[in-house]
């Protein structure tokens, strides 16, 4: 019996084989296209992620003055049991005399003065539940720190006392996210200071202000991962998530990252540290044992409750 033919030229079995082969090739092509799309998506997402968490690439660690690489007394070398309160002139004097760098907190008062205090309220240290941003300098300095005769110092008073002896880390404590008035006012005041200083903040917009308007000033991004804390300090919000995972670094492009060392198992922090190798500061280190362990992992350590 003769073979059935298609168009009087090809056996039907041959046609079916060719159609099957063409189908296989088409499926392979579709599969390759799909894999290529997946690869492009992966590379795009990875590239975007790295773009977000990358620190500054213009100022490498080696270009930061060597004088900055030392331990920093957190809010000065304070000891409340000895009557030396945090962020007080005696605490700053003790730190400077011993050669420690100083980390301190800067607020803007209602009448435009710069004071040195950590909390937004006076409640913890002065026993009055009043907001610094809603008080004048005269009102703030009418109170005393704890049971001492010390008042909350102005930034001018601290600068006069330290007088360039040790480097300073100024943490900018903004009341409202993105309010750059504090960054600008601090910069104007610090232009006349002859000592070494740098700034840091949890607010990436304030750090970005220095990137855009004062790129010569060393700037740092403060962060920690509240999700890795086991106590009431946990915070859950979009801004805390972005901050914890360093996803705002694209705004600030920090010269150094100051990260809460208790939470530094965070994936973004570890990726950033491994790939970009930026200058790193650990906060807050509270024991000599931790200090020794962290020496090989961080460039600067901000410490309290002991002396390294």
Language-model features and meaning:
Residues 10-11, 190:
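Intrinsically disordered, low-complexity regions enriched in Ser/Pro/Gly/Gln/His and often acidic
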Residues 11-14, 97:
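Short linear sequence elements within intrinsically disordered, low-complexity coil regions
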Residues 27-308:
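Phosphate-group recognition and catalysis centered on beta-loop-alpha active-site segments
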């Amino acid at each position: 019996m003769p073979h059935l033919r298609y168009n009087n030229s090809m056996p039907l079995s041959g046609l079916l084989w060719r159609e099957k082969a063409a189908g296989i090739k088409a499926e392979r092509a579709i599969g390759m296209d799909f894999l290529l799309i997946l690869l492009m998506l992966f590379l795009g997402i990875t590239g975007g992620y790295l773009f977000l968490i990358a620190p500054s690439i213009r100022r490498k660690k080696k270009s930061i003055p060597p004088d900055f690489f030392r331990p920093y007394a957190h809010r000065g070398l304070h000891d409340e049991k000895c009557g030396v309160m945090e962020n007080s002139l005696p605490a700053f004097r003790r730190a400077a005399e011993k050669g420690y760098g100083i980390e301190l907190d800067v607020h803007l008062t209602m009448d435009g003065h710069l004071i040195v205090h950590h909390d937004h309220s006076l409640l913890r240290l002065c026993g009055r539940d009043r907001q610094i941003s809603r008080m004048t300098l005269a009102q703030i300095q009418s109170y005393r720190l704890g049971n001492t005769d010390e008042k909350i110092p102005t930034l001018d008073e601290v600068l006069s006392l330290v007088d360039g002896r040790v480097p300073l880390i100024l943490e900018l404590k903004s009341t409202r996210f993105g309010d750059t008035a504090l960054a600008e006012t601090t910069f104007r005041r610090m232009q006349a200071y002859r000592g070494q200083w740098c700034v840091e903040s949890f607010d990436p917009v304030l750090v970005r202000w220095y990137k855009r308007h004062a790129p010569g000033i060393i700037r740092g991004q403060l962060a920690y991962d509240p999700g890795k804390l086991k106590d009431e300090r946990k915070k859950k919000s979009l801004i805390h998530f972005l901050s914890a995972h360093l996803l705002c670094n694209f705004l600030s492009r920090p010269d150094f990252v100051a990260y809460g060392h208790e939470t530094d198992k965070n994936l973004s922090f570890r990726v950033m540290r491994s790939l970009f190798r930026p200058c790193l500061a650990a906060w807050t280190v509270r024991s000599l044992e931790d200090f020794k362990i962290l020496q090989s992992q961080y460039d600067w350590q901000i410490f309290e409750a002991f002396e390294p």
